[in-house]
Regions:
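Extracellular hydrolytic enzyme modules, especially secreted metalloproteases
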Residues: 144, 156-332
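Bacterial N-terminal signal peptides
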Residues: 24-34
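Surface-exposed acidic, glycine-flexible loop patches that form ligand/cofactor-binding
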Residues: 45-50, 123-150, 311-314
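Aromatic-lined ligand-binding clefts that engage carbohydrates, nucleic acids, or primary amines
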Residues: 153
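Boundary at the C-terminal end of the N-terminal hydrophobic targeting segment
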Residues: 37-43
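Non-catalytic C-terminal accessory/binding modules of secreted extracellular proteins
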Residues: 47-49, 55-62, 67-73, 88-105, ...
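Divalent cation-coordinating acidic motifs and surrounding scaffolds
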Residues: 73-75, 79-134, 177-179, 199-200, ...
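N-terminal secretory signal peptides that target proteins for export/translocation
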Residues: 1-19
Length: 416
């Protein structure tokens, strides 16, 4: 497949409603970017450098009672889009490539593998059986040591399987670091396993594969779901009010929302997620002392050329604030509920989003807007955040193009 065809496919997938003459010019520009191995101008500091490739094996799974609704070309296109997304989110540092097997028919009907759409109500034995049957079917013709993650791509629809996508490990089957899955030939299945129906959105693909890439550290998932699991149990799907579970990060990160709207690409990921994946260079993280006054020009998180991508205010060994700037630029942050400065409180002691607790949570600039869609701070009127307990004041002093000058006070003027 030519690079020109790849770029055309990417544009079509993102459903850009451009006029034909504008589109022609942009295809040429992006073609040149691809030819020179730079994902786009926003990640130009990575231009010329090789990306860290995440190689995956996609096992196509069919069931005896239903015919696959898609073909291999459809699946390949989905993962081509994932690569495009990952390159932009990592500023060109990381890319992904997959090998796709032929269709493997499992011994049981899809009903025997079907699960609940609510995470806390999933029959784990069914997930384990699906993974083992699919991996065993692919054992003979595939060398699993060549890959860092495995995907089961089902020829079934969401309503037939019960969940549009999930992470088997580290996820539904737990996240013990000593878990080892072996094939009948004795091959070790590396990394982890994600499962998707063919209707999975690009944001869902990233969400569950990111769980695998994050892995397990200190007995915790590095990248957990950022929606509340207990609320999701009561509102498991979009039709059942899934947005109610978005109490931590709203629609500002696909680890929380998967996507903002079904018919558009997912939003970009937050600085918290990028930091946990190791996708933000250390020199672009400005660490400030909350006891001293600091001013920082904060560039857009989507623009990898920004001198500062995130501000970190450490409160203790495990707690801190992150400040990022989200602007409608690039291919994905244009699909956000708003724009401005996001302020997040993080607590590394918290592993999962349960019972109202979360390892990261947005401070909400406008609580009157539901589902944290008004969380961004942006002048006029929403330029100040105050933490009275820790005596910290965060103020947007001015806007400079797409950047902001942000002042972090020492708290002397903040009354408890």
């Amino acid at each position: 497949m030519t690079r020109f065809k790849i770029v055309k496919d990417v544009f079509r997938s993102l459903e850009w409603n451009r006029r034909r003459n504008v589109l022609t010019g942009m295809i040429f520009v992006f073609l040149m970017c691809v030819v020179h191995s730079a994902p786009n101008a926003l990640g130009r500091e990575q231009a010329g450098g090789a990306c860290e490739k995440r190689k995956g094996l996609v096992i196509l799974v069919e069931f005896p009672d239903i015919a696959p609704a898609v073909d291999e070309a459809f699946v390949r296109d989905r993962f081509k889009k994932l690569d495009f997304y990952v390159r932009e989110m990592s500023y060109g540092k990381v890319c992904t490539d997959v090998d796709i097997t032929g269709w493997h028919r499992l011994p049981d009907s899809v009903k025997r593998y079907a699960i609940s759409p609510a995470n806390l109500q999933v029959d784990k034995s069914r997930v384990e059986r699906l993974i083992r049957n699919a991996v065993n079917a692919a054992d003979e013709k595939n060398d699993f040591l060549r890959y860092s993650f495995v995907v089961l791509f089902l020829g079934a629809a969401f309503k037939e399987y019960g969940m549009v996508g999930l992470c088997g490990y580290p996820g539904m089957l737990g996240w013990k670091e000593d878990v080892v899955l072996r094939t009948p030939k004795g091959q070790i299945v590396p990394g982890g396993v994600a499962i998707f129906t063919y209707q999975a959105h690009l944001g869902t693909l990233f969400h569950d594969i990111a769980h695998v890439w994050g892995g397990v550290r200190g007995g915790q998932r590095v990248l957990p779901c950022l929606y509340d699991h207990d609320i999701q149990a009561r509102h498991p799907t979009s039709d059942a009010g899934f947005a109610e579970a978005l109490i931590n990060m709203g629609y500002w990160d696909p680890l929380s929302c998967h996507f903002y709207k079904r018919n558009i690409p997912p939003p970009g990921i937050s600085s918290w997620t990028k930091l946990r994946l190791g996708w933000i260079p250390e020199e672009k993280v400005r660490v400030v002392d909350p006891k001293e006054e600091s001013e920082v020009v904060l560039g857009p998180l989507e623009d990898g050329s920004s001198e500062t991508l995130v501000i970190k205010i450490r409160l203790s060994e495990s707690t801190y604030y992150l400040i990022e700037n989200r602007q409608p630029i690039g291919n994905f942050d244009r699909h956000l509920p708003g724009k401005g400065v996001l302020i997040m409180y993080a607590d590394d002691r918290i592993g999962e989003c349960r019972h109202g607790a979360s390892p990261v949570r947005l401070m909400n600039a406008d609580p009157a807007v539901p589902y944290l869609q008004g969380a961004a701070f942006d002048p006029p009127g929403k330029e100040l955040f105050v933490d009275k307990k820790n005596k910290i004041e965060i103020r947007i002093v001015e806007r400079i193009g797409d950047s902001y000058r942000v002042r972090i006070s020492n708290g002397k003027c903040v009354k408890p």
